[in-house]
UniProtKB/Swiss-Prot annotation:
Gene name for this UniProt entry: ybiX
Cofactor(s) named in the record: Fe(2+); L-ascorbate
Protein's name according to its UniProt entry: PKHD-type hydroxylase YbiX
Cofactor note: Binds 1 Fe(2+) ion per subunit.
Segments crossing the lipid bilayer: none
GO biological process, one term: DNA damage response
Residue numbers binding Fe cation: 96, 98, 158
Protein source organism: Escherichia coli O6:H1 (strain CFT073 / ATCC 700928 / UPEC)
Length: 225
């Protein structure tokens, strides 16, 4: 399943990020990809050795960790270190699949269950640059407002179309979920959304408490901690 997570960063935060990123040191994006990805990748990434990068990636982690909808959809166990990329002048990233595991500074290794892109450019400011994701439900083309995030299974083939005008800047990361199975995670997300909707309409009740009990028992049964 694919999820749109709105408002991860406020417009003020996005403007501040863009101002900082204009001063950042950018390097060839192929430095962080494997042999297969390097053949189809043509973009730039912020140099991860800089102090500016360390500060910005920490802010992204704080923002997603504090976003209730992100947590409900991803049920994250481990988040990768966020990276930042830039596309301009017909740069693109052809169809590829993300690696199944990635190194992690604290945990050694993490499994990539979900991929996330946090958009930092207004969609009207550039042409092209759509994230195209192929999954069991078909092909999805994504170009979200700045500050919004998209979550999708890391097992999906995906690409970024050429940016023919302007500049597309984004942050991206991977998530190891407490729930490995996409279908089970989607069911828990739907159940959680329905519980929250019922509570907002009817307040607390024995029936809602029973559903909440079911949610946590399923989470207990399926989670890998």
């Amino acid at each position: 399943m694919m999820y749109h997570i709105p408002g991860v960063l406020s417009p003020q935060d996005v403007a501040r990020f863009r101002e900082h990123l204009e001063q950042a040191e950018w390097v060839d994006g192929r430095v962080t990809t494997g042999a297969q990805g390097a053949q189809v990748k043509n973009n730039q990434q912020v140099d991860t050795r800089s102090a500016l990068y360390a500060a910005l990636q920490n802010e992204v982690l704080n923002a997603v960790n504090q976003h209730a909808l992100f947590f409900a959809a991803a049920l994250p166990r481990t988040l990768s270190t966020p990276l930042f990329n830039r596309y301009q002048n017909n740069e693109t990233y052809g169809f590829h699949v993300d690696g199944a595991v990635r190194s992690h500074p604290q945990n050694g290794w993490m499994r990539t269950d979900l991929s996330a892109t946090l958009f930092l450019s207004d969609p009207e400011s550039y042409d092209g640059g759509e994230l195209v994701v192929n999954d069991t439900f078909g092909q999805h083309r994504v170009k979200l407002p700045a500050g919004d995030l998209v979550l999708y299974p890391s097992s999906s083939l995906h690409c970024v179309t050429p940016v023919t005008r302007g500049v597309r800047v984004a942050s991206f990361m991977w998530i190891q979920s407490m729930i490995r199975d996409d279908k089970k995670r989607a069911m828990l997300f739907e159940l959680d959304n329905n519980i929250q909707s019922l509570k907002s309409h009817y307040g607390e009740s024995e029936e809602i408490l029973s559903l909440l009990n079911l949610y946590h028992n399923l989470l207990r049964e399926w989670s890998e901690i």
